Amino acid sequence: MSDFPTTARVVIIGGGVVGVSTLYHLAKAGWTDCVLLEKNELTAGSTWHAAGNCPSFSTSWAIMNMQRYSLGLYAGLAEEVDYPMNYHVTGSIRLAHDKNRMLEFERARTMGRYQGLGIEMMSVSDMKDAYPFLETHDLAGGLWDPDDGDIDPAQLTQALAKGARDMGASVQRFCPATGVTQVGDEWIVHTDKGDIRCEKVVNCAGYYAQRVGEWFKPYGGRTVPMTVMSHQYFLTEEIPELKEWTEANGRKVPLLRDVDSSYYLRQDKHGLNLGPYERNCKAHWVTPEDPMPEDFSFQLYPDDLERLEWYIEDAMARVPILGSQGVGRVINGPIPYAPDGLPLIGPMPGVKNAYEGCVFTFGITQGGGAGKVLAEWITEGETEWDMWAVDPRRYTDYTDQDYCDRKAMEVYGHEYAMHFPHHEWPAGRDKKLSPVHDKVIAAGGMMGAYNGWERANWFAQPGDDTSHESTQTWERQGPWAQRIREEAEAVRDHCGVLDLPGFSRFNLTGDGAAEFLRGKITGGLPKIGRMNLAYFADNRGRILTEISVVRHAEEHFTLITAASAQWHDYDVLNSDLPGGVELVDHTKDFSTLIVTGPKARDVMIHMGTDADLSLGWLTHQTAQVAGQECALLRVSFAGELGWEIHAKNANMPALYDAVIAAGAKPFGMYALNSLRIEKGYRAWKGDLSTDYSLLEAGLERFVKLDKPQEFPGKAALQNEKQQGRKKAFANLIVEAGAHDAPYMSTIWH
């Protein structure tokens, strides 16, 4: 009798650490009727050759949460599942060559402290005491991560698999998945051994995730945005001095990361393991001459140490004993990269009951947390922490393969680079352009990418330093500072215009459209001819998204939301759309100008319009402006008198020329951000996320607990109102000296 399952609640495709961790966490949640499929042996893809480093450090709040959870899980896993595991918690030292790096470390330290981590700053003398072989003469300081270390990736994966099996889940090795078929709300996963009918399916296929992802395209999916990179590290022969020190002290030396030189250096037995992230990096399987093989299980690329020559020499100068012995073994294997270097964890865009847990660059340290997050998505439909940073829906239709390849090369070669607040990375740009892009550039626009859309961050004047190097600072002052001040003052004192392409825009029509929205949002709907801001909550009353609702008729709405929210919010709206109600994405058909400031009405009159400019706040109308048909929304995110001019792309050049001729000064996203913070307006995923409830965010006026309709989170918000909120949104004036507080900075009182 065959033990091959023909039904399951969930089928996971891929038996690396992330897939197995997902199975383990599903089983822990009580979902034991789940199956994992692996085409070869567990760990056969990228997991088996991973270095196994386990930092808690990250500059991303979501990633730090995942890694913190992983390390806690790994510490007790061997005992929990009764499986031996080599896990060495050695601590780690990150080296800083200058003040800028120390500032980055300080920000990460405070984030970690808020999460309960013991990350601390280190002096040069402390580093020398902790790592006696380290050359420190040119260092500014460092960062100590006491929880860092290394783990055996294969043992970790097998321990998770044993735990999952012991709870009743199924692992099918040497069982390649060959395709999927959607039947109603369920899936049939095809394999070499037969078909499995399931409720949900998860793509955890590692560097084969793009190939597996193609199976879902007939059902609304897209090509998984990723590129496979070659990552190389080598192990030295035994080093006598290191062996002697280890035996005398009863421990390994800490893991070392020289982030300014872009490598990690770790003790492996009595030798060293050096792993650089080189600028002259190499992508694989991206050309017809180098196709992805059908099976690359437990295989490596040929050694290519010449690429690493500079990094090897630099590391030998930093830790001279590295050069005392020869190379024992070279590992050169495939690692998948998303365009921003962060994994894809969450709902598969456009496909119901399908999920992704793939494209992990640091899958070992993130694997435990990723399995937890995926299991929460699958079983609860929401996650404990806000995970937008890794949500697959953060990427939309602009991520073609050329873009993915360019960004992967850039991110890999700058793996340890600092992400300064005024710096824009140059690779993969100009994917989506405004109808007046050339005019904005001609006016001095210094551009930034927002969900692929190019928008001006600020406007440079002749003689301003616009070099790449000028943005390599955490300081507020730079060539942009005076220009941003001038732009903000123009909006405050006169009138400014911001070209704002890329607003996500949906048309909702049909019998029942209004009642559908009432059952989705926490507040009420606007009257015909008006608009309002509506909030969508999850089942805990936390902030899922915010959308501007423009009402044209009883059952006709335009829904406008952030550029980055396009696929996320489409999923939120489309997931339970009733019959007879139609949702259409018009994002690419229209563009927007923000005309705002105390003289905005005068500017609009000068442009020539038949609009009624006396209509009040949160009204909308269709009008002719500068001879062009457009929609006028009486609203401004800058907090001043103003209108949003929404028009078809073909009409925008004439409108832009007219508003400039009428005296409006171009301003950019940096000035807008300053103005909206001054007003106290919140930004989605900056200030508002699923880490906070609507009541904690101070949005009570957008919550109608007395309305008859049930909506997600209503019961939770009612309970929170009775019990009292645990956190409160606050606007602070902070004396920050020369530096603005970067996103997710911790402020201590």
Where are these regions (language model features)?
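Acidic, proline/glycine-enriched N-terminal capping motif
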Residues: 394-537, 542, 670
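Flavin-dependent oxidoreductases
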Residues: 21, 180-288, 293-301, 310-318, ...
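Dinucleotide-binding Rossmann-like beta1-alpha1 core, especially the glycine-rich loop
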Residues: 52-130, 253, 260-265, 269-273, ...
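Glycine-rich FAD pyrophosphate-binding loop
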Residues: 27-47
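Central beta-strand plus flanking loop segment that forms part of the substrate or channel wall
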Residues: 51-56, 92-94, 207, 221-247, ...
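Conserved, structured C-terminal
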Residues: 421-447, 455-457, 476, 552-749
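C-terminal catalytic lobe of FAD-dependent flavoproteins
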Residues: 153, 260, 269, 283-287, ...
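Flavin (FAD/FMN) cofactor-binding and adjacent substrate-gating region
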Residues: 76, 88, 97-167, 172-173, ...
